[in-house]
Design a protein with these regions (language model features):
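Active-site/catalytic core of tyrosine-dependent DNA strand-transfer enzymes
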Residues: 60-61, 127, 150-201
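N-terminal core-binding DNA-recognition domain of tyrosine site-specific recombinases/integrases
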Residues: 1-23, 27-33, 71-76, 181-186, ...
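Conserved tyrosine-mediated DNA breakage-rejoining catalytic core shared by Y-recombinases
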Residues: 38-41, 99-159
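Short, leucine-enriched amphipathic alpha-helices that occur as contiguous helical runs
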Residues: 14, 60, 77-81, 184, ...
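C-terminal catalytic core of tyrosine-transesterase DNA break-rejoin enzymes
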Residues: 27, 85-96, 185-197, 207-233, ...
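Basic, Lys/Arg- and aromatic-enriched nucleic-acid-binding interface segment
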Residues: 12, 31, 37-94, 98, ...
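Proline-centered turn/helix-capping motifs that create local helix->coil transitions or kinks
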Residues: 26-35, 118-124, 159-167
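DNA/chromatin major-groove-contacting recognition/catalytic segments
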Residues: 124-128, 221, 240, 244-257
Length: 257
């Protein structure tokens, strides 16, 4: 499995599932020996840590500039442009952003509350087409959190509200022109359009989150606070994810912003 490129966490989950399965079979006397006993789980150090892709300081500025572009008639070039800037400077997970409602925004106190998540599910009847479902929970217990808004995030969401808020706090911040849920595919397409126009070699929403985290590291914020803002279940996850980011890249971020 390691040779196939699977991550340590994926292999560990498979190992634990198989081990539990065969242990139960031994208990039920369906087999006499657990074949997983002789299987050695590779250590985490044996895996090559992937280099996270993050935007440089100049690229973050360029992203903001392009995402907020206006057409000749004054209309926004990108319907979700201000929303994407907001995500870039709050570090929200994709599902958290798509599940965000106006009631979760507290502009007076400069904060946003994260307490739910959007996932794509099937109907359970064999149809391949998936539909969006709002989970009244997030990825981890620590994921329920309040994130303070910096000036850029506050301005971006204020502009978004001025354009799209209709007075209903139950409405979702990210929704289509017809009022339906925006899907991960839709939002990924939107962010990639901004990347392309800005001539940034990047793809996907996750880069916005990684860039914000790296930006906070470069600014010298303590890891325990970064972990809390990101909604990680432990500080160790934050370390494991971001300590390998290239230092020169971090230095470029902090000097360019």
């Amino acid at each position: 499995m390691q040779k196939q490129g699977l991550s340590h966490s994926s292999i560990k989950k498979a190992y634990e599932a198989l081990n539990g399965f065969f242990r139960q079979y031994v208990v039920e006397q369906k087999i006499v020996f657990n074949p997983m006993v002789g299987v050695i789980l590779p250590s985490k150090s044996q895996f090559n840590t992937k280099q996270l892709q993050v935007l440089s300081g100049d690229e973050m500025k360029k992203f903001v500039s392009v995402a907020a572009e206006k057409l000749k008639k004054g209309e926004c070039r990108y319907r979700y442009g201000y929303g994407l800037i907001f995500v870039l400077y709050t570090g929200l997970r994709e599902g958290e952003a798509l599940a965000l409602q106006y009631k979760h925004l507290d502009l007076k106190n400069r904060k946003v509350r994260i307490e739910q998540n959007l996932v794509m599910v099937t109907d359970g009847l064999g149809n391949k087409k998936r539909r969006p479902l709002i989970q009244r929970s997030v990825k981890t217990e620590a994921g329920v959190r309040e994130i303070p808004l910096c000036d850029i995030a506050l301005e971006a969401i204020s502009n978004h509200i001025a354009l799209y808020y209709t007075g209903n706090d139950e409405d979702y911040v990210f929704k289509t022109r017809t009022g339906t849920h925006l899907t991960p595919h839709n939002i990924s397409k939107a962010v990639n359009q901004v990347f392309k126009r800005a001539k940034i070699d990047a793809s996907g929403m996750h880069i916005l989150r990684h860039s914000f985290a790296s930006y906070l590291f470069a600014k010298g914020l303590e890891v325990k606070y970064i972990s809390k803002i990101l909604g990680h279940s432990s500080i160790q996850i934050t370390y494991d994810t971001y300590v390998h980011t290239d230092f020169e890249q971090l230095k470029q971020i902090v000097t360019a912003i």
